[in-house]
Every structure is written in structure tokens, then in C-alpha cells.
């Protein structure tokens, strides 16, 4: 094998990932020398001036993250990274399973809880999980800086196991609500902390794809829930097996948790520099010692700044800074807006009530039909895994939301004609035209395809929006917004179908999608391929849509040049 060519020295003392951009030189002073390019010229255009500001901030404030240094093998996923992402994503599997299991359970539970469940009781049972997830999500980000990310994952698994056992053994509606609430705590903890954990361990160039793996696990969990639900449709007390089996993956993850590393940033917060360096070296096995040290040095600068900030501020002051500091506020608006859009589009009505809807439409095994919907969700989440980094977050959202809008409009139209004979209301055991029922199903599949490719996973990239000292609080608030909107949707869907008709309900969801598209078009910058410090810089003066696109374009060009050196 030929010798590896020497890597150009583009990393000292601190550089951005753009080898052509200026690097400050230190000569015993903390103040950088004049910023200039390697050929001696000064920045000329807007992009170059913007990037010179990035470098100057890195030099003066130490605000860069480790993504500001590109190393050899940056765009490769090693076995170690695959192992830790796969193990962490088991929480995503549980998240998906426990939110989808309710769909198959509701159609076969009958009077096993002492009464035939009314629409209101079904909504309360479903919403109990969402309320638990709301509280769990709020708690996760707030405590994870103190406990570490791994311990929060342990707490989530304990909740998954306890809630599953409680549901499987319950004999009253109140006990079922309690079990769903406990499971919801686990869902909230997992939904907040796992994307954050993966994002902090992932190399910058593939961060989006690795976080999306957790979304793939969520959709896979939904498929498993529908498959198990379909298998137990005709089994006495089969619903107890459906909810009880949800505990099994938790035992697997608890066994694997000892092999998962803590986030290097958490280790640096604990002054464990050696531990952080060892984990970083495993993540970047092709990197030189100098490159690993440089990443640790830059990470430590950001962590030290956060420690100093935290030492001189209370938790409430950091919470206040999310609203009062412009860069933090804009990041919070983006994160909360995307999470609200993810739920208000109505997708989880399919996850919670698809079996109920398809049973009313006349499909014999409604849970099996729901399995088709969940499978499409998995397939197009895999598409998202492929495109989320190279195509970009913003472009993906702007392309897929119109697909969702179109599909929801189709569904509203088909529901209108489908229910003409029943005064616009879906009625059980009514013989609806099979052709229109199939058209409703097809429109929902198109809707799910659009959702899974964009809105289903991109909001969970929220960790990249916030600086370290407010990242835990920021992601908690965004996750809480997600589950608050989820609770609104889950707790009103059946009632909305009765009050506004199915056609009206899906028309309302289409309207929310239109608002979401306008939000993304006006406010959402492109964060794909940018280091965490660069994302922060983008928000310094407005929402930085054009600035982010310019930075990303230039970084892609420079990354291609660097890659060509080693080919």
C-alpha cells in the first residue's frame, strides 16, 4: 500500500475547516495578528469577511467546537461509532414502539379494563403518554449536564420497563393511564437526550446522518409495534402482550450501557481531559495525535467558557439568556418552531389512531394496514438518512412540506366524498366504498413519505442550534414544545373528527403544514455541514439564511479539495 501523503498544516494554531481562510497567528499574545489568507491577501468578498469573523471569534473567545478542525477520516463512520450510535438508538426503538403500540391495543382491548372505552377515555389514555413525555423531556436536558448523558438513558430504560409492566398487569382505566404516563416519562427522556448524545459524539460532516439513525430506530419501533399488534389481534388478552413486550429492548440497552462512552464534553466538564481524548481518538481513528489534541483543545476552550459562564450565572439566568440574548433566542425560535410543526401537522394521529381509522373504513385487519403506513415511514426515513447532510436541512424541508400539504388536501377531499352518506362522520360497521377507502390510504402513504423524509427527523437536529452552556435547557424546551403539541393533537383528534368531520380535521392539518413551510422559508437557515460554532455565528445578525448557505457552499468546496489530497 502506498504511503499516505503528508497532510497540509492547516490546523495551527486554531483554524476553521476552510483551509483557504485566514488563521490568526499567536506570538505570545492572546490577540490575533491581522487576518489574512495564506497568500498574504486580505478578505475581499462577503463570504471571506464573514469567515474571517468566525476565525477571529475562535481565536479571541475560544467559541469553536471540535468540528472547526477537519481531520482525515472525518466523513467515515467507524465500527466504534456504529456501535455507540446503534446502542443509543435502542431508546429510539422504544420511543417508536411505545407510541405506536397504543394503536393496535385500542382496537382489541374491548371491556378488559372493566368498561368499553369511550372516545374520551381513549384520548386520555393516549395523552397520558404524551404528558409523561412532556415532563420527561423537560427534565432530561436540565439534569443531563449534571448527571451525564448516559445516566439519563438509564433512567429512561427504568421508566420503559416499569411502565410496560404496569400496563400489562393493569385491570382498570386508571392503572392503564398510570402505566402509559410512566412509559411517557421514558419516551420524553429518550427523545430529548439520545439525539443530543449522538450529536455530541458524531463527526461534523456526518452528524445529521447519525442523528437521523435514531429517527430510523423510532420508525422501526413503530413497525415492530404494528407487526406485533397484528399478530395478537385474535389472541385473548393479546393487548397485554403488545404492551408487555415493550420492556424487552430496555434490558438489552441496560446491558449495553456500560460499553457506551460518556460525551467528551461532559468529561471535559468533569475535568477528565484524558478520558475525553481517548474517546475522541476512537471516534477519529485515522486522525493524528496532533489533530486529536487540537479537537480536544478547541472543545476544552468552549467547555471552559461554559464553565465560567455557568459559575457566574444561575440556572434561571441561563434560561433568561435563551430569550434575552439574540443568538440564543433565534436558535430557540427555530428549534421550537420546527418541533411544533412536526406535531401540528397531525402525523401522530396516524401512529395513535390509524388502526381505529382503518377499522372504520372497512379494512378487515386494520392493524396490518397500519403496518403498511409504518413501513413506508421507515423506508422514507432511510431516504432522509441518505440526503439530510448532502442535500441539506433547509432544502429538504422546503421540498417535502408541499408534498405533505398536497397529500392532506387529497385526504380531505376523499374523506368528504367518502362520508357523504353518513353526514360527514365516520361510523363503525358502515359499508363505505372500497375505492374511496383505498384512495384515503394512498393519500396517507404519500403524506407519510413526505413527513418521514423531512419533518419527521430534521427537528431532532435541534442540539446543533444551541451553544453548550444553554444546550441542555434549549433542547429541553424544544422537546417540551414537541410533546405539548403532541398532547394537543392526541387529546383532540377523535373529538375533532366528530366536530369538524374527518375532511375538516385533515384540512386543518394541511393549514398547519402551510404555516410550517412559510416558517422554514423565512427563518430556517442551512445548518448542514457547519460546525456548532459556525451555526452560532450564523444567528448573530438575524436568522442568517443567506449567510449559512454561503458558508456551507464554501465549506463543501474546501472539503472536496482536502479530500482530493488523499485520493
Swiss-Prot record:
- Membrane-spanning parts: 89-109, 124-144, 151-171, 181-201, 210-230, 241-261, 344-364, 368-388, 398-418, 436-456, 477-497, 504-524
Show which residues sit on the Cytoplasmic side of the membrane. Answer: 1-88, 145-150, 202-209, 262-343, 389-397, 457-476, 525-567
Glycan-bearing residues: 365
The way it spans or sits in the membrane comes to: Multi-pass membrane protein
Q: Name one GO biological process term.
A: myo-inositol transport
Which residue ranges are assigned to the Extracellular compartment in the record's topology?
110-123, 172-180, 231-240, 365-367, 419-435, 498-503
Molecular function as annotated in GO: transmembrane transporter activity
**Which catalysed reactions does the entry list for this protein?**
myo-inositol(out) + H(+)(out) = myo-inositol(in) + H(+)(in)
Chain intervals with Polar residues compositional bias: 16-33
- Induced by what? Induced during sexual reproduction. Expressed during infection of host.
Q: Which Pfam families match?
A: Sugar_tr
Q: Name one GO cellular component term.
A: plasma membrane
Keywords attached to this Swiss-Prot or TrEMBL record, sorted alphabetically, are: Cell membrane, Glycoprotein, Membrane, Transmembrane, Transmembrane helix, Transport
**Region Disordered: which residues?**
14-42
User: What effect does gene inactivation have here?
Assistant: Increases RNA level of ITR3, ITR3B, and ITR3C. Reduces mating hyphae production; conjugation appears normal. Simultaneous disruption of INO1 leads to an exacerbated mating and sporulation defect, and attenuates virulence in a murine inhalation model of systemic infection.
Q: What Gene3D superfamilies does the annotation carry?
A: MFS general substrate transporter like domains (1.20.1250.20)
* Compartment list: Cell membrane
Q: Which family does it belong to?
A: Belongs to the major facilitator superfamily. Sugar transporter (TC 2.A.1.1) family.
Query: Which NCBIfam families does the UniProt record give?
Result: SP
**Protein role:** May function as a transporter or as a sensor for myo-inositol.
Which PANTHER family does the entry link to? Answer: PROTON MYO-INOSITOL COTRANSPORTER
The name under which this protein is listed is: Myo-inositol transporter 1
**What is the species of this protein?**
Cryptococcus neoformans var. grubii serotype A (strain H99 / ATCC 208821 / CBS 10515 / FGSC 9487)
Q: Which gene encodes it?
A: ITR1
